[in-house]
Amino acid sequence: MFRQKFLSKDFITKIIEKAAGKVTRIMLEDFLSCIEKETALHYFTKSSESNLLRIIQNQFDIAFFINECLKYPHQIEILITLSNNSNYLTDILVRNPEYFHWIINPSVLEQKINGKYFKENLEKTVAPFKSIESKVNAIRNFKRKEILRIGLKDIYLKEELKNITLYLSFLANSISAILFELCYKEILNKHN
């Protein structure tokens, strides 16, 4: 794909349609200008633009989103980095737009994570649920959220590959252990 020097007219039109009547013209122009400045620092393609548009269009409150992006420029940097580098991480934010406000918190992104962290938080996540289906769904959501964090540690914070691999291993081990325990209990309940 070829690098885009400017945002497409289609992108701008769709953002204007989404934000119409919710933010001032000046705020919208500033927002688009900030996006364009940040995209100039990356190898931004049509695919990247499409990813970015999907993320923005799926925000619950576009006025709040634009206002926050203008107040905290690192949010636009995270958006561009993510949409430019990963379709998978983009899909996570499209499916769960609320994760964006979680992940932009520097304390969340920079938090040191290890096997103990994943194990304890995964146990807390599934504890309130009774059925195996709801527990598995909670595990799925936890996995998506943590994959987003690990992915951004890689592409945004530029952490070492060794650490990223370690985080993914910790996450996989924790998920495997809790799933094994759930399945084991389910089988015991069925045969007792």
PLM segments and residue spans:
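Non-catalytic regulatory/linker segments of enzymes
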Residues: 1-192
